[in-house]
């Protein structure tokens, strides 16, 4: 029987359709929850999952695979686990945990997953970056050589910080650690206003770990009032957030800061504080049944912080010359810097600023212990004029502390010792500074020059702050600008005449 032309055409059409038929099925690897509790879910069936991969629970909550065992996978839940039940389906996403990054993040407050929590709507144009990446290699780095000014006289003169450095802020609770960090963010306002190009601007990322929501709210208000939020990103994993989010927040903030570092820009990141991150990680590790070590922390708690802080770096000229400067904060208990976490972080960082309760209560604020505080690489980045002025400052303060300890026992001191005590008390007074009042570097140089060269020696202690205000208000702007370039003999003569005139008015 011969087919009609129409039937033959239909047959050919069906044959070609059958040959070209391809069913595009979406295949998901799924597992089932075996047990859940305390923010940890044990899941059976996810045989191909990667370490650090994101998973999705049936109720929409996300989680991350941390323990890969023979039978089950230990997953930390990023959110409430009350709605997750035994037998629920868990789906692999195929992607490692990532967060949004880019300039669209500036001025925003986000959680540890990068989701905005400030009520200003969704994020605009941004890119996704993995939270866990390898730190830049040796050849991709350059030694620190540009200053990162905090606006604090005691820090910029004695423990200078460079762009790309890691400087630890360590001290007991309520000693002013966060204040130093916030002052540093506020000080970038006047530096950014002078920046002529994008590569000179300093962007800031503040990561709040395990803090009260009220504290974070006050912080946002402080930054908003100073117009500092426009160049800052806030990542908040507060005390009420689950431990996995407190563990993740520093890595998320670091990924956001790395966007600027890798695109030839400069960023400052503050982790406030890493003690709480270590506690959150200990909680997760113990619930995942990992073996505990010293102080019940898991064996890899050093790696927890080292892999985070190594990502702060100054990039080489070939890779864009960007930088990421880190100011991690560690809270000590009763001044014990030899505990496990403090010693770990001290050994990882490029120096530390030690704050003491006793100094704080004596009214020396910022309460920096100059003897214990060091900056291992920052001096290479210090301005020439500041170096010239501060040469004798640290030595004189060290001699003062030594003599002051003995002076308590007797009053019959010779003239040289009396002069040393007198000078030391005035230098200590000059280094005091109110909170949220950072000073530009040229003004710091002027004030410290006056103190080091004896212009305050005959002045009563209670008049020193008055003298400081007087010289800062009446100095010529061109002389201030000239100070940045260094101290020549002509400038010294001009400065001496000006400072002497102002000092005589107050003695």
Swiss-Prot record:
InterPro entries: ATP_synth_asu-like_sf (IPR023366), ATP_synth_asu_C (IPR000793), ATP_synth_asu_C_sf (IPR038376), ATP_synth_F1_a_nt-bd_dom (IPR033732), ATP_synth_F1_asu (IPR005294), ATPase_a/bsu_AS (IPR020003), ATPase_F1/V1/A1_a/bsu_N (IPR004100), ATPase_F1/V1/A1_a/bsu_N_sf (IPR036121). The keyword Mitochondrion applies. It comes from the Eukaryota. The record marks 373 as: Required for activity. PROSITE patterns: ATPASE_ALPHA_BETA (PS00152). It is found in: Mitochondrion; Mitochondrion inner membrane. ATP binds at residues 171-178. GO terms for cellular component: mitochondrial inner membrane; proton-transporting ATP synthase complex. Its main location: mitochondrion. GO terms for molecular function: ADP binding; ATP binding; proton-transporting ATP synthase activity, rotational mechanism. Keywords: ATP synthesis, ATP-binding, CF(1), Hydrogen ion transport, Ion transport, Membrane, Mitochondrion, Mitochondrion inner membrane, Nucleotide-binding, Transport. GO terms for biological process: proton motive force-driven ATP synthesis. Gene3D superfamilies: 2.40.30.20, ATP synthase alpha/beta chain, C-terminal domain, P-loop containing nucleotide triphosphate hydrolases. Mitochondrial membrane ATP synthase (F(1)F(0) ATP synthase or Complex V) produces ATP from ADP in the presence of a proton gradient across the membrane which is generated by electron transport complexes of the respiratory chain. F-type ATPases consist of two structural domains, F(1) - containing the extramembraneous catalytic core, and F(0) - containing the membrane proton channel, linked together by a central stalk and a peripheral stalk. During catalysis, ATP synthesis in the catalytic domain of F(1) is coupled via a rotary mechanism of the central stalk subunits to proton translocation. NCBIfam families: atpA, PRK13343.1. F-type ATPases have 2 components, CF(1) - the catalytic core - and CF(0) - the membrane proton channel. CF(1) has five subunits: alpha(3), beta(3), gamma(1), delta(1), epsilon(1). CF(0) has three main subunits: a, b and c. A stretch of 270 kb of the mitochondrial genome is duplicated within the centromere of chromosome 2 resulting in the duplication of the gene. The expression of this duplicated gene (At2g07698) is not demonstrated. It is also probably not RNA edited and therefore differs in all the positions known to be edited. Belongs to the ATPase alpha/beta chains family. This is ATP synthase subunit alpha, mitochondrial. It comes from Arabidopsis thaliana (Mouse-ear cress). The gene is ATPA.
């Amino acid at each position: 029987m011969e087919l009609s032309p129409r039937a033959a055409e239909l047959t050919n059409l069906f044959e070609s359709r059958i040959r070209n038929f391809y069913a595009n099925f979406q295949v998901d690897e799924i597992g089932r929850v075996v047990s859940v509790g305390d923010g940890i879910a044990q899941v059976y069936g996810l045989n191909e999952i990667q370490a650090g991969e994101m998973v999705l629970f049936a109720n929409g909550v996300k989680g991350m695979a941390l323990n890969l065992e023979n039978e089950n996978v230990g997953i930390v839940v990023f959110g409430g686990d009350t709605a997750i039940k035994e037998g629920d389906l868990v789906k692999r996403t195929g992607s490692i945990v990532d967060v949004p990054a880019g300039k669209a993040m500036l001025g925003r407050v986000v959680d540890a997953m990068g989701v905005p929590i400030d009520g200003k709507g969704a994020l605009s144009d941004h890119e996704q970056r993995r939270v866990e990446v390898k730190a830049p290699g040796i050849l991709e780095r350059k030694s620190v050589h540009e200053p990162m000014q905090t606006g604090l006289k005691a820090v910029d003169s004695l423990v200078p910080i460079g762009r790309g450095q890691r400087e630890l802020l360590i001290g007991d609770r309520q000693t002013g650690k966060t204040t130093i960090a916030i002052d540093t963010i506020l000080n970038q306002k006047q530096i950014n206003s002078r920046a002529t190009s994008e590569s000179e601007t300093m962007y800031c990322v503040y990561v709040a770990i395990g803090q009260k929501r009220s504290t974070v709210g006050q912080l946002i208000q402080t930054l908003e009032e100073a117009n500092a939020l426009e160049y800052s990103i806030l990542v908040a994993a507060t005390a009420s957030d689950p431990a996995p989010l407190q563990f993740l927040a520093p890595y998320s903030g670091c990924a956001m800061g790395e966007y600027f570092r890798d695109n030839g820009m400069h960023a400052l990141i503050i982790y406030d504080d890493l003690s709480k991150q270590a506690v959150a990680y200990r909680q997760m590790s113990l619930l995942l049944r990992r073996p505990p070590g010293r102080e019940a922390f898991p064996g890899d708690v050093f790696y927890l912080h080292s892999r985070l802080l190594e990502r702060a770096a100054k990039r080489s000229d070939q890779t864009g010359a960007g930088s990421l400067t880190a100011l991690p904060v560690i809270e000590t208990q009763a001044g014990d810097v030899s505990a496990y976490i403090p010693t770990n972080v001290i050994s990882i960082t490029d120096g530390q600023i030690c704050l003491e309760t006793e100094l704080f209560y004596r009214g020396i604020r910022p309460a920096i212990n100059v003897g214990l505080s060091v900056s291992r690489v920052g001096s290479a980045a210090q301005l020439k004029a500041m170096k010239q002025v501060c040469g004798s400052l640290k030595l004189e303060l060290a001699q003062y502390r030594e003599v002051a300890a003995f002076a308590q026992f007797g009053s019959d001191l010779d003239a040289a010792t009396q002069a040393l005590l007198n000078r030391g008390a005035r230098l200590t007074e000059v280094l005091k500074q109110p909170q949220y009042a950072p000073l530009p570097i040229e003004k710091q140089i002027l004030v410290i020059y006056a103190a080091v060269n004896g212009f305050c020696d005959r002045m009563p202690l209670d008049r020193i702050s008055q003298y400081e205000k007087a010289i800062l208000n009446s100095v010529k702007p061109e002389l201030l600008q000239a100070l940045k370039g260094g101290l020549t003999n002509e400038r010294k003569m001009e400065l001496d005449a000006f400072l002497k005139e102002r000092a005589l008015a107050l003695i």
